[in-house]
Amino acid sequence: MLIFAAILAIFIYGMIAAMLGTILPDLSDRFHLSPSQNGTIAFAQALGLILASLAVGPLLDDEGKKVGLVLGLTFISIVLFALPRSSGFKSIVILLFLLGVGGGIVVTGANSLVSDVSENHRAMALNLVNLFFGLGAFATPFIAANLFGRNWVRLCYTIATLTVVTLAFHAATPMPGPTGSGRFVLTDVAPALGRPLLFMVGLFLFLYVGCEVGIWNWLVRHLIALGIPEKKALNILSVGFALGMLIGRAGILPILSHVPAITVTMTGSVAMAITTFLMLRTTRPAVALVLVFLAGISMAPVFPTTLAIVGDAFPRMTGTAIGFVITCGWTGLAVSSRIIGFIAGGDPRRLKKALMVIPGSAVLMFALDLAIRSALR
């Protein structure tokens, strides 16, 4: 039941992770938003993710995972019911900040729960559960394009309803309280977490999350700027990127029992750099679909496998350690959102240049992987 609870939470997080990129074109048209304002909205969501992930780690270690998951799902439900009633740019920024808070709590709580439940097969369990992130992320743009006719209001209410159902399930599911060895004690923070490895992994996720969520948030707008119809652009995001992540996380499961986790992240970094660079060079929808799909496969195992490395390296205060590196990831999203929005300015066609931040970050990730591998020896 605990793994199933984590799966439901990650599925909901997958749906909201793909949501901003899915509804951004319609929001931009309705409220006349520029790419620079889009960057501010993405920054607000990232700021919420940062603050939540930073604060929730000690809460999870001190009070248990259930408190965090219920709190995060409550935030998400409220925001999604309120978003269709937003009146303009400022209210959207506030609501996306709160959505980030809820998402940050949920993703940290769910991954920490799985890490504790499956200590002997942590990498496989985290990739299995995060497979459903890909399923949720696939569902959002696919439903918007093919079932709701790009009606973002219906999309918000549908995901909000699913979140309420998930919230009820978590509230009714018994979950273990904090363990004695992982319980947050302020005086233990420095010796438990003050290792260079944690900061190297944090910097790695700083780069990675900016890449992955950058595609979720900006790809559709970029494709539309190239002249690709919105429905086709949404399907490239869902059938291409989201489905690639879904298949990639399913395919990596048997490999993880034979290959070290650091080798998986190194391979993913190289593949990310190549596929995202080529993805941004093409203007043909069919080629873009294939390259976006391959980029999704490349990125699929990176995030959960990195969390597994943290879980193995920090058996004490695991929730706090995972919360820290995830916070670093959301910080990367905040920084990259500002950079991409600044480079693009008021012209969506400049996103082609701005999004080159993604393959550049992947190259730096590979260099960090080499340092992390040395630290693990």
Indicate residue ranges for each PLM-predicted region.
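Helix-to-loop junctions at the C-terminal end of transmembrane segments
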Residues: 52-64, 248-260, 344
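Helix-loop-helix hairpin linking two adjacent transmembrane segments in secondary transporters
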Residues: 120, 127-174
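Extracytoplasmic gate region of multi-pass secondary transporters
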Residues: 20-21, 195-239, 243-246
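Conserved MFS/SLC helix-loop-helix module at the cytosolic interface between two early adjacent transmembrane helices
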Residues: 51-90
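C-terminal transmembrane helical hairpin of 12-TM major facilitator-type secondary transporters
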Residues: 259-306
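Interfacial helix-cap and linker-helix signal at transmembrane-aqueous boundaries
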Residues: 27-28, 59-60, 143-150, 223-224, ...
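Cytoplasmic helix-loop-helix junction between adjacent transmembrane helices
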Residues: 95-131
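Helix-breaking motifs and short loop linkers at transmembrane-helix boundaries and internal kinks
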Residues: 32, 64, 85-90, 119, ...
